[in-house]
From Swiss-Prot:
Residue positions binding S-adenosyl-L-methionine: T71, D92, D118, A119
Pathway, per record: Quinol/quinone metabolism; menaquinone biosynthesis; menaquinol from 1,4-dihydroxy-2-naphthoate: step 2/2; Cofactor biosynthesis; ubiquinone biosynthesis
Reactions this protein catalyses: a 2-demethylmenaquinol + S-adenosyl-L-methionine = a menaquinol + S-adenosyl-L-homocysteine + H(+); a 2-methoxy-6-(all-trans-polyprenyl)benzene-1,4-diol + S-adenosyl-L-methionine = a 5-methoxy-2-methyl-3-(all-trans-polyprenyl)benzene-1,4-diol + S-adenosyl-L-homocysteine + H(+)
This protein's name: Ubiquinone/menaquinone biosynthesis C-methyltransferase UbiE
Main function: Methyltransferase required for the conversion of demethylmenaquinol (DMKH2) to menaquinol (MKH2) and the conversion of 2-polyprenyl-6-methoxy-1,4-benzoquinol (DDMQH2) to 2-polyprenyl-3-methyl-6-methoxy-1,4-benzoquinol (DMQH2).
CDD domains in UniProt: AdoMet_MTases
UniProt key word Transferase: yes
Pfam family, one: Ubie_methyltran
Organism: Neisseria meningitidis serogroup C / serotype 2a (strain ATCC 700532 / DSM 15464 / FAM18)
Enzyme class at the top of the EC tree: transferase
HAMAP family reported for this sequence: MenG_UbiE_methyltr
PROSITE patterns: SAM_MT_UBIE, UBIE_1, UBIE_2
EC number(s) stated in the UniProt entry for this protein: 2.1.1.163, 2.1.1.201
GO terms assigned for molecular function: 2-methoxy-6-polyprenyl-1,4-benzoquinol methyltransferase activity; demethylmenaquinone methyltransferase activity
Length: 245
């Protein structure tokens, strides 16, 4: 595998190097991640996540896996929906992000199971979860196809995968969006997080992520029987929903 190439932002790297490079980015941004999310999206990320939570139709006692759960925004929402009789796992491949998320939830009085987990090799049994979610994490994974197959594997029949991710913006807005992403975003990263390079990577990773229709097909190829998506904020983000029959 070491000889195969993949992208890290706009750069080309060996597949076995990407995970380490992505880890460096998120170790760097973890402490300022929530602040930067608010600044970068003008608070819209909260609206996108709220919409995602309302889409799930969870019931008390359900089991949920939050992949690349980061600072715990979705896990908090899922825990409120499934109640004490339910089960919500907060997972992330990055220890710094997972620590921030765990501590944040503990400070709010929420005790959830956490796992340092690779989405391409999930440490959970087949047909276990009612819902799997991944928000703003899929684009950083080296083998997205393998990760999607793992998400399918751990879902119960009738279970749902929700993928909230940056996507392809409507064409008339591309110029303004590029200016914001590549001129302003790294500057904000430098001023607020003292880290322009990491936010340059994040902007590049968004452009390299599959568009809405491509991701839909990838989910179908991974085994999902029904897939659709909903664009938000002119396509800046899309919520893909896959169902396992």
């Amino acid at each position: 595998m070491g000889g195969q190439k993949t992208h890290f932002g706009f750069s080309t790297v060996n597949e076995d190097e990407k995970a380490g490079k992505v880890a460096e980015v998120f170790h760097s941004v973890a402490k300022n991640y929530d602040i930067m999310n608010d600044v970068m999206s003008a608070g819209l990320h909260r609206v996108w996540k709220h919409f995602t939570i309302n889409t799930a139709h969870l019931k008390k006692g359900d089991k949920v896996l939050d992949i690349a759960g980061g600072t715990g925004d979705l896990s908090r929402g899922w825990a409120k929906r499934v109640g004490k009789e339910g089960e919500v796992w907060l997972t992330d491949i990055n220890s710094s992000m997972l620590t921030v998320g765990r501590d944040r939830l503990l400070n709010e009085g929420m005790i959830l199971p956490v796992s340092l987990a690779d989405a391409e090799k999930l440490p959970f049994p087949d047909n276990y979860f009612n819902l799997v979610s991944v928000a703003f994490g899929l684009r950083n994974m080296t083998h997205k196809d393998a990760a999607l197959k793992e998400m399918y594997r751990v879902l119960k029949p009738g279970g749902t995968l929700l993928v909230l991710e940056f996507s392809k913006i409507y064409k008339p807005l591309e110029g303004a969006y590029d200016f914001y992403s590549f001129k302003l975003l790294p500057v904000m990263g430098k001023l607020i997080a003292k880290d322009a390079d990491s936010y340059q990577y994040l902007a590049e990773s968004i452009r390299m992520h599959p568009d809405q229709e491509t991701l839909k097909q990838m989910m179908l190829d991974a085994g999902f029987d029904s897939v659709d998506y909903h664009n938000m904020s002119a396509g800046i983000v899309a919520l893909h929903k896959g169902v396992k029959f």
